[in-house]
Amino acid sequence: MQKKNLITAALPYVNNIPHLGNLVQVLSADAFARYSRMMGIETLYVCGTDEYGTATETKALIEKTTPEELCNKYHAIHKSIYEWFNIKFDIFGRTTNKYHKETVQDLFLKLDKNGYITEKENEQFFCQQDQMFLADRYVTGECPNCGNNTKGDQCENCSNLLVTNELLNPRCIICKNIPIIKKTKHLYIDLPKIKNELEHWIQQIDQNTNWNINAIKITNAFLRDGLKERTITRDLKWGIPVPKKEYENKVFYVWFDAPIGYISITKEIIKDWESWWKNNEDTNLIQFIGKDNILFHTIMFPSIELGSQENWTMLNKLASSEYLNYENLKFSKSAGTGIFGNDVITTEIPSDVWRFYIYYNRPEKADFQFMWDDFMERINSELIGNFSNLINRVLTFYKKFFGDKIDKIELNENFWQIVNIKYERTINFFKQIELKAALKEILDISRIGNKIFQDKEPWKTKNSTPQTTKELLLNLIYLIRDLSILISPFMPHTSDRIRSFFGKSYEISNKFLGTNLGLTTIQSTEVLFTKLEKQLIDSLKLKYSGRTNMQDEKNKNSINLFSEQICLKTVKIKTIDRNPDAEKLFILKLDDGTPEGKQIVSSIADHYTEEELIGKHIIIVDNLKPAKFRGIRSEGMLIATKDENKNFKIIIVEDFKDNPIPGERVILESDTGKELKSPTKISIDKFLQAQIVAENGELKINGINLILEHSKEKVLSKEIPNGKIY
């Protein structure tokens, strides 16, 4: 009997917006869960938000709200981001669910009854200013192991679990004062007492097969250093109350209650939850985590299960990943560095494209740097130039010259012998949770298809040997069906689109792989993806590069930069069309004072109708390098004001000047009377480095007004008086 797969992704803290690095675990677990279902394995994928503890309490203090309101806010944000990424949880719950308290307290009482809970008086930081004991994340200081600045629970730099009062140069995060040491009582889990059972369990697991190298190293090092009693209570209000006399005013430490959340969240949707969580014989527990969570899943959570002396389903496979970082910078919402889940949605780059790149570079054995230029290169060459190209060229060619009907043929033995070996390798990589290797194997299969199409030159043989050519193409069509199945764990929407080309006449199942089943007609075809343009990527790179990276060394003086390298002009909008491949993109034909005029493409359809803009005069960056958006050439960029609330308005010249003149330049007031330069073409990065702003309704650079060259009228932003110009 085949075992069931119980899959979890580390519960994300509900005190922030997830960035790309945070998404690695939920996406990895999603791909594995989809693979598991594809193989016909009974599968349950559980995740949810981790809502209790100091991280939530401290964030609520910062946002001046209650922990409950904060959790409601960020749970909704997380849920919407994961939905956009098309992550197929069986349940995405919360540790504030109705079963969590009783589940945590029940496990604690069993540990206490079995003699695995101890009491200790210890010394803890106490803030005299705020008159409270400071739980670990209420204290910042220097890690005693590596010297990195950290909070008091775990060092993000060296991953060591910390004892809070060992921090060097500690400070209270609320008032920034130096705390004192004061005695208090806490409860501990007696890890040394569980050590023998824990080590016996670890020895039974084939770590070399089921855990990655880093997880093995970190766990073995922790065991080698000797297990110590670990505190499980905290002096907080927001948490699961401790059901023990004299401890009623304390709550459980979040590391103790959070892993139990996997169980309580499961209870929300499955009455017979024990068939998953108390069924070690028939269930594989597969957990996806970041490297900073390894010890909580290999030592702490298993110790709780073992200490309860019940038949809990124990960890089998552990898929821990390294960090995904950003352009050699640290993800920081406040500093504006890195791209976060809500930012990704606004890029208008499809979710499957993001999924592809994250899996392609999944940090399985080493940290990985997200780089915009590499993102563009991989998408354009691998996803589009290889994978999408095969599907488009084969289906359109077959449909054009051989019609819609797909004949059932005997498959070419030599071709499929090679391909089936690749299928076996792909499935094995999935099974071992080597997701990056699985994806690259799929891309290799696609390359084989492209090479055969290119080498056999069906465009030359379609008339001379039509049947042979048709059979060649049919073999490739069955290969495309298989690719749509294999790629589905990584790019489910793309898989569905390919299946729709065939009327969804087959299921996402490994049973179809390498067969001549499931295909009857080609109902439709379309291009799956469009290339990422450099202008878009450059603008996104700049947007998320952080305040300190907005200018390069050559152009620190934004006034000189504008005068010497930027040309703004007034233009009249003559016509507006919508891009047939992208409804949100307007194609604007402009009168710029020249006989040929100008054309720009702009994503403003969400903000304006055609009728509001036709006939109006606007200002454009006239010397921007031409670029293509969804295949349409754009020869400039209109300018607009955006404020801190993301309100957006185009600069309309009629707001401050009657009878504007198409082609009139916009200059700095300080350049009046000077000979103006005709600057060379520039990138959008260069324009943004000028840092034009709206101040009290007037456009300025470093306090100097922008004006129309001939009329000397000041350029105004009437509807949004204060903001940045983009």
Swiss-Prot record:
Q: Motif 'HIGH' region, which positions?
A: 12-22
Q: Pfam families under this entry?
A: Anticodon_3 (PF19303), tRNA-synt_1g (PF09334), tRNA_bind (PF01588)
Which reaction(s) does its UniProt entry say it catalyses? tRNA(Met) + L-methionine + ATP = L-methionyl-tRNA(Met) + AMP + diphosphate
Quote the subcellular location field of this record. Cytoplasm
Q: Which GO terms describe its cellular component?
A: aminoacyl-tRNA synthetase multienzyme complex; cytosol
Which keywords label this protein? Aminoacyl-tRNA synthetase, ATP-binding, Cytoplasm, Ligase, Metal-binding, Nucleotide-binding, Protein biosynthesis, RNA-binding, tRNA-binding, Zinc
Which positions does UniProt annotate for ATP binding? Answer: 333
Q: Could you tell me which Gene3D superfamilies the record lists for this protein?
A: HUPs, Isoleucyl-tRNA Synthetase, Domain 1, Methionyl-tRNA synthetase, Zn-domain, Nucleic acid-binding proteins
User: Coiled coil located at which positions?
Assistant: none
Give its E.C. classification number.
Answer: 6.1.1.10
What family is reported?
Belongs to the class-I aminoacyl-tRNA synthetase family. MetG type 1 subfamily.
- The name under which this protein is listed is Methionine--tRNA ligase
Q: Which organism is it from?
A: Borrelia recurrentis (strain A1)
